[in-house]
Amino acid sequence: MKLRLDPSTQSNYHDVSISKLDWHARIDFDQELLHGKVSFVIQSARVSQALSHIILDTSYLEIKNVTINDIPTPFRVDKRRGFLGSALHIVPADEIPSSKSCILTILYSTTKDCTALQFLKPEQTIGGKFPYVFSECQAIHARSFIPCQDTPSVKVPCTFKIRSKLPVIASGIPCGTANFCNGSLEYLFEQKNPIPSYLFCILSGDLASTNIGPRSSVYTEPGNLLACKYEFEHDMENFMEAAEQLTLPYCWTRYDFVILPPSFPYGGMENPNATFATPTLIAGDRSNVNVIAHELAHSWSGNLVTNESWQCFWLNEGMTVFLERKILGRLYGEPTRQFEAIIGWGELEESVKLLGEDSEYTKLIQNLEGRDPDDAFSTVPYEKGSNFLYEIERVIGGPSVFEPFLPFYFRKFAKSTVNEVKFKHALYEYFSPLGLASKLDSIDWDTWYHAPGMPPVKPHFDTTLADPCYKLAESWTNSAKNSDDPSKFSSKDIENWSAGQKSLFLDVVYEAVSFPHNYIKRMGDVYSFAESKNAELSFRFFKLALKSKYKPLYNTIAERVGSVGRMKFVRPIFRLLNEADRAFAIETFEKYKHFYHKICASQVEKDLGLSE
């Protein structure tokens, strides 16, 4: 197989093998910096070839000192290459024989331009008394707070020793504290399983925790703890047991969940032993717990078995969505799995429409040469990938035939990486002895992998739970087209509906027409979408209002989008606000841009055409 390099790294990871990473860091809340020392156990990755040159990824780092086996070693930091950052070149005084390992140590500090870290002032937190910092490394931001081979192709076991005046969380099992000094402690963590750089995480702030299962705790600010406990304790262990039944025994010892401040840019981030999640999950009625199923599924798909590069991101996210819905199906019935897939298909259609049917970013296998992986981020790898697996399952003979492949797959590639070629080979390896190779042959692999746009096959989903949503949406749409009086609609229309059904209703009416303003007002009044604590509902309704240019809600929408950093909600709202009232959109962004994480702010700037 021809060697394929990850275009999103400048490191020479095919030449340099890293077997262990030991990271010491001190958090400086006053200067909003991190001072670090990272040590790698390295050796040549080439058989019988000495190691003479080491290249690591960095971005906005101040490199202070480099040693190899404690001997000072010259280094050079290249000029920045845009989103790729600045390559760090290290040339040992003497070549390192292929049979010998050594310890490479780098002393450094982050800078104000660090894209992985967000420091929060006390007033930006729930408690309002202490500062806070958290990281977000996916896709290629780890290089901005630690020099590394910043590619998912490289996975290493790690130890973390982090000094802070506030409690710390990192991507490993806590091993205690040590060395109290000047009001701060060292917090120790160990990650025995090899992990890629995008799963490195750090968080420090005013934290409290409580158990939400026999192997799970939730961490958050004290003022939010009881709400988080209620939201997750009912489902956590049930999800873990269902996931293990589908895959392999959980190998990470503990699955802990961290609810972050509202500026966190994603729904969740599957950091091992410390899943980071948005507070928008806290709806008060456990209606967003499917995100737990998704992040938990990453323990196998993504964390245990990792996409080789961001060009085949679907192998992380598509498989994870597929597992997430399998878990929900096991616990709540197959119609629930099918219903979630219907919502996902609608989100995929919206993404393809936004990106363009011929866009490179609508392919399963994407060419990211010269492209920032953050720009490629959409629901495509999630939903197109999941639907591809759904189609393979259908072709091969259904769940009873396909599901036994899952533990085989995760066992085969455990603690390693996978690409689309290896994935396909694994399918043939498993199903050919069962006489099912011809079934796999019937799949149009090239179209699924490389064609842009919607999938070549649309699944036939069970619409039992969706039909009432379609019926009510049709009634609203027809009434609006006929200019009927909307007073006939009442809260009883959606009585006993799940949050998912309400979401689907809003998705369908959003795609149908731009509603008259009296219809938007009536919908808001009788269904209380704008006031909903479930952000999935309120932001869907806000999209509908903006599409219909319903100005009475503009200020409410601006306030809400300025209090939530989750890009799933923020970016669509700003795009629609830009279409409805560009001046107001820019004014709103300028008002709140320092609230957002840099990843989010950067993407919104591009959406609004404000970036250089």
UniProtKB/Swiss-Prot annotation:
Residues annotated to bind substrate: E136, C137, Q138, P265, Y266, G267, G268, M269, E270
InterPro entries: Aminopeptidase_N-like_N, Aminopeptidase_N-like_N_sf, ARM-type_fold, LTA4H, LTA4H_cat, M1_LTA-4_hydro/amino_C_sf, M1_LTA4H, Peptidase_M1
Keywords, sorted A to Z: Cytoplasm, Hydrolase, Metal-binding, Metalloprotease, Nucleus, Protease, Zinc
Cellular location(s): Cytoplasm; Nucleus
Binding of Zn(2+), residues: H294, H298, E317
Function comment: Aminopeptidase that preferentially cleaves di- and tripeptides. Also has low epoxide hydrolase activity (in vitro). Can hydrolyze the epoxide leukotriene LTA(4) but it forms preferentially 5,6-dihydroxy-7,9,11,14-eicosatetraenoic acid rather than the cytokine leukotriene B(4) as the product compared to the homologous mammalian enzyme (in vitro).
Protein name in the entry: Leucine aminopeptidase 2
Gene that produces this protein: lap2
